[in-house]
Amino acid sequence: MRKTILLILLLTGSAIASLAQTLPVTGTFINLPYQDVRNKYTNPEGIDGTDPQMWAAKVSEMKEMGMEYLVFMSVANECKAYYPSKLMNWHYPEDRQSPVDAIMEEAARHGMKVFMSTGWAKDQDDNLRDPAIKGRQIEMMEELAGLYGDHPAFYGWYLPVEDCFGPVLTDYAVEAVNALTARARELTPHAKIMISPYGIFNSDFNDPRYEQQIARLTVDIIAYQDEIGCVREKYPLPRLRENWKKLRAIHDKTGIQMWANCESFAWERGTNDRQSALIPAPFPRFLSQMAAATEGGAEKIISFIICGMFDKPGSQYPMGQPYWSEKAYEDYMAWLGGDAYWKAAEEYFLSAEVPMEKVTDAAWIKYKAGKHEMEVEPCDGQLTVAMLNCNKRGIVPPVKVSLYGKAKGRWTLVETVEPQKWANTNHDAFVDQAIFRGIPAGLKKMKVTFTVEKESYIYIIGK
């Protein structure tokens, strides 16, 4: 099949210069207890999750990644504490430093800021409608304030009240958050207070009560879960971009900081299943999430979760999915360091004029199985072939893409690029890219050739 088209989009230098700089991830949750199979890689059973030396090393590695904020998901589980509690028994050997103390100490050494959790009173299913659970969380807060309120790394409180914001936050959720907040302000007046709710995918932004309920909250920061890892919709990223902007408009009126909690994980088996392990998402998906949060007006980006999804190669304490957690680390650090490939991908995700992660976007050009070539408008700088990767629908990028140029009557191969291959693609839709740089000047014609194995969606950009 032969298809001849002109370039869909030419990005000029001025257009590229106007693109925002994507916010990096500057905070992450710390996950201490092994609760279920979801934590297979974030807190492996084969590693002592209470080892203070291990946590000191991991905090140092996270600092190298640019983390400024550490958020304890919980500091107790099943009525055992990960800190020297007098309220409950300890979840670590009594003859050594607690994991909470080790993390706080290393965080202080690196100038990092820690949000202390008030959970769990019992376990990950704490129900604040139960007076005993609510009372124990307040008792824990009081004890933790006495132990760490003056610690140089203590920055504030994370309230593990992950109520659903959609379609509208309930009165009970508002009251539960505000009750904990009131006690936190009495104990630690200068501490920042943060929640990280879910449910923006089905939030009713048109209901005036939605904004009113947010305005009633007395917290300092709402770090919304972007729910891309949880895959609450078939194609969640395009609508997320609009929802961030709607939330930004609300937060401009409330004075509450709007942070993004960009989920870095995919699922080894089924989604949202406690018997399915969290695994690293392909980096193009995660980069698109960061770009969406930036463009939508988030003030900071944190992530559930860095430790276990990203792992430094050669770490003294290896953690995460073999190979893929190290690759996630290398890809993120390459982007952070200004790698040309990932910066080009970032430009794509920040552009409003290109197709995104949805098969129904009319800008995609669909190709069936077979060999294809398309003639494109010549350009002297960079040519990007964007490709939708939606394995769950049988839509995958070509195995390789070749660029040919014609200057003096003959087609000459310029370069062949093999798109990166990803393993953890069972549930997501994201955009991959093949990027050609150093295109020879003076080409009269250019064409791209590729072979499609199943079905491919392609879009071409030049600059």
Report the location of each language-model feature:
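Aromatic- and acid-rich polysaccharide-binding/catalytic face
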Residues: 152-165, 198, 207-238
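An active-site-proximal structural segment forming one wall of the substrate-binding cleft
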Residues: 94-110, 128-156, 213, 293
